[in-house]
Design a protein with these regions (language model features):
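Proline/serine/threonine-rich low-complexity linkers at boundaries of modular beta-sandwich domains
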Residues: 1-2
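Short acidic/polar inter-strand loop motif in beta-rich domains
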Residues: 91-99
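Short, aromatic- and glycine-rich surface loops/edge beta-strands on solvent-exposed regions
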Residues: 83-91
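Short beta-strand edge segments in extracellular beta-sheet folds
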Residues: 102-106
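Short strand-edge motifs at loop-to-beta-strand transitions and within beta-strands
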Residues: 71-75
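Extracellular Ig-like/FN3 beta-sandwich strand-entry sites
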Residues: 17, 80-84
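Contiguous segments within soluble domain cores/interaction surfaces
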Residues: 5-63, 68
Length: 106
């Protein structure tokens, strides 16, 4: 099972810029390394991260082999209304992780 950590403020003022931080536990194998016997280790990376705020996409990242293991993604958005932030990570070999966080806008 995929392990993720997300930091979102529980409340914010309307119009306030908020910072969101996410961390996904993943080895991010590039597909360029070889075993001791010379065999290529297959690529296994998170390929995409998406964040939706009350159903509307507010952030998307396409990840490549150069991204470190356990990628930390931080970004900002404007708090417009109370609701749900939904986070989705997808990747090679059927990798899928989801997380939801609530925010109250006053």
């Amino acid at each position: 099972m995929a392990r993720v950590a997300v930091t979102v403020p529980t409340s914010a003022k309307r119009g306030e810029i908020i910072e969101i931080k996410t961390l996904a536990q993943h080895v991010m194998e590039t597909g360029f390394r070889r075993t001791q016997t010379g065999e290529l280790i297959p690529r296994d990376i998170i390929t995409e991260f998406v964040c939706r705020y009350n159903g509307a996409e507010i952030f998307r990242a396409e990840l490549r082999q150069a991204v470190a293991a356990n990628p930390l993604i931080a970004f900002t958005t404007v708090a417009t209304e109370s609701g749900t932030l939904e986070f989705t990570w997808t990747g090679d070999n059927g990798y899928l992780a989801n997380h939801k966080a609530e925010i109250k806008v006053v």
